[in-house]
């Protein structure tokens, strides 16, 4: 069982800087736990580590997919576990860094995602529930799960429609509760470090980060994605891109689109924090207002590695 450090939290709280410091101190390699950083060409809007930063420490699961490819949580789990094994074999410490909650939960808890999810019956069930979600909303679909399997619903946020539908799919296919489905034992030993800060400070930093992304060429990057048909691809669903597509289509102004990016980013950050606090065991730190806590984090990791 490999030891793995995960660094989680919303955007603009210092995950990249901390990951570089920890990797350099403990001989680590970074695995991106972000669902959008796999796409080549989407550098600014996904806040990838820079070329210079990646030259300091090996990074994995960045720039491995074309913008027209899909990349599911099951794909991530398989790829990340492969990287963990290879990094461990090299005698290095795997560091999973990112903010895509369910991707990290699937990896940390070794969730059984099911290899049957691509058969026709499963697809039909999912299509049915997706249609209902479109017509009646995510809350209604979650309530249907709550009626059938309250224990499962208690562990799955309303916003995680894919997971809610997956639970309903398993119930309908097997006739058994999703919450009673056997889960495989943990595959690796994770220490989860969470970064956060006071909400007004976080929101200010998010707004500043969006402004910096625009200065760095976000609109040009999003326009390239739009011209490639990215509006209809998984890659085009990311915050920072989807809000700009209506601007390129001429239906909203540039300023309106940028304000929407900031709003969506703030809302997403709030959801990320809620997810990690409700779904995972995390050691929380605020490096924005208390930078000396970096030493505390290093001491925590050092002690955990010696166990």
UniProtKB/Swiss-Prot annotation:
The reply on keyword Lyase is: no
Q: Where are the transmembrane segments?
A: none
Which leading EC class covers this enzyme? transferase
Keywords, comma-separated and alphabetical: ATP-binding, Magnesium, Nucleotide-binding, Transferase, tRNA processing
Q: Which InterPro entries match?
A: Dimethylallyltransferase, IPT, P-loop_NTPase
Which molecular-function annotation in GO is an example for this chain?
A: ATP binding
Question: Which residues are ATP-binding?
Answer: 9-16
UniProt cross-references to HAMAP family, sorted A to Z? IPP_trans
> What quaternary arrangement does the UniProt entry report?
Monomer.
Q: Which family does it belong to?
A: Belongs to the IPP transferase family.
This one is known as tRNA dimethylallyltransferase
Query: Could you tell me which species this protein originates from?
Result: Limosilactobacillus fermentum (strain NBRC 3956 / LMG 18251)
């Amino acid at each position: 069982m490999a030891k793995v450090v995960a660094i989680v939290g919303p955007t603009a709280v210092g995950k990249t800087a901390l990951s570089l410091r920890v990797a350099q101190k403990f001989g680590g390699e970074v695995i991106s736990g972000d669902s959008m950083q796999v796409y080549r060409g989407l550098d600014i809007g996904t806040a990838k580590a820079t070329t210079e930063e990646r030259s300091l420490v090996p990074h994995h699961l960045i720039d491995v997919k074309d913008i027209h490819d899909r990349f599911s949580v099951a794909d991530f789990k398989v790829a990340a576990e492969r990287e963990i094994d290879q990094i461990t074999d090299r005698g290095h410490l795997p560091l999973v860094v990112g903010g895509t909650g369910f991707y990290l939960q699937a990896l940390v808890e070794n969730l059984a995602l099911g290899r049957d999810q691509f058969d026709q019956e499963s697809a039909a069930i999912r299509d049915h529930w997706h249609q209902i979600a479109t017509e009646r909303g995510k809350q209604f679909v979650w309530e249907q799960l709550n009626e059938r399997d309250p224990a499962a619903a208690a562990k799955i946020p309303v916003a995680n429609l894919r997971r809610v539908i997956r639970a309903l799919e398993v119930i309908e296919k097997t006739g058994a509760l999703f919450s009673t489905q056997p889960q495989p034992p943990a595959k690796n030993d994770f220490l989860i470090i969470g970064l956060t800060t006071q909400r007004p400070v976080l929101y200010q930093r998010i707004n500043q980060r969006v402004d910096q992304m625009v200065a760095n060429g976000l609109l040009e990057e999003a326009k390239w994605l739009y011209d490639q048909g990215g509006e209809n691809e998984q890659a085009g669903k990311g915050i920072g891109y989807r809000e700009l597509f209506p601007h390129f289509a001429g239906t909203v102004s540039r300023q309106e689109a940028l304000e929407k990016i900031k709003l969506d980013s703030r809302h997403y950050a709030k959801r990320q924090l809620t997810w990690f606090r409700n779904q995972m065991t995390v050691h929380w730190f605020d490096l924005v207002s208390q930078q000396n806590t970096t030493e505390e984090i290093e001491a925590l990791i050092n002690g955990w590695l010696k166990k």
